[in-house]
Structure formats: structure tokens, C-alpha cells
Regions:
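N-terminal glycine-/serine-/threonine-rich beta1-alpha1-beta2 phosphate-ribose binding loop
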Residues: 1-92
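Rossmann-fold NAD(P)-binding glycine/threonine-rich loop
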Residues: 82-92, 99-127
Length: 127
């Protein structure tokens, strides 16, 4: 399963570390391999503990537009561009995981409808 991450701050770095460290356990439990294929950040020159530099991109729109993603994890926060990026990921066939309370409170119905229409999942917590 190919995973993209939107946001590489404190939370994003931890999510990236967990995704990379837990691949064997996930594969043993599910029969699927997890592969972190990209992390969208504002500044690719910053050191990001737990995130290999070759995975960093400042082209979030390009990352979520890939047609081969299975899951997009959004940890960037805020309403925009998170909303547009999630809608693009959904349109391109990726399921989405977010803990973005502000986004889900204001656009949860729109995002849920888009995911339902596209036949993908939208998971959220802490919302």
C-alpha cells in the first residue's frame, strides 16, 4: 500500500517514523506492505527527523495527484490548502486519514460526500 503524508512537522515526522518502523508488523497482520512514497512540506531544506530527504517534496498538489496512492495522511492542519489537497487525493482514488478538527468541523460533510462518491474511505479522529 502506497502512503503519502501531507505535513512534516512534529506530528508528521512521528507519523513517518511509525509508518516506516511498523511495516513488518503491518505486513504480518494484513498481508500488505506499507510504503511511504512522499511527504509534502513547505520547506524541503529543513531537517526532518524520521523522514528520508528523498521523500520530501514541496509539491503537495503533485503528490496527491499521483494515481498510485492508496492512502493519504493529512497532518498539516488548517482549512486550506488541506481541503483542496484532500479532495484531490479522493478524486484520484486515495483513501484519506486526518485528525484536522477545524477542517472536519467546517467541511466534513463535503469531504465525506466526495469520498462516498469516489468509493474511498475518509477516516478521522480527534474531530
Amino acid at each position: 500500500m502506497k502512503v503519502a503524508l501531507l505535513g512534516g512537522g512534529v506530528v508528521g515526522s512521528q507519523v513517518a517514523s511509525l509508518l516506516q518502523a511498523g511495516t513488518a508488523d503491518f505486513a504480518a497482520r494484513s498481508g500488505e506492505q506499507l510504503e511511504l512514497v512522499g511527504v509534502a512540506v513547505r520547506d524541503t531544506s529543513k531537517d526532518r527527523p524520521g523522514i528520508p530527504a528523498e521523500l520530501l517534496t514541496d509539491d503537495a498538489a503533485g503528490l496527491v495527484s499521483r494515481g498510485d496512492l492508496d492512502i493519504v495522511v493529512e497532518v498539516m492542519g488548517g482549512i486550506e490548502p488541506a481541503r483542496e489537497l484532500i479532495l484531490s487525493a479522493i478524486k484520484n482514488g486515495a483513501s484519506v486519514v486526518t485528525a484536522n478538527k477545524a477542517l472536519m468541523a467546517t467541511h466534513g460533510a463535503e469531504l465525506t460526500e466526495a469520498a462516498d462518491h469516489a468509493g474511498v474511505d475518509l477516516f478521522y479522529d480527534a474531530s
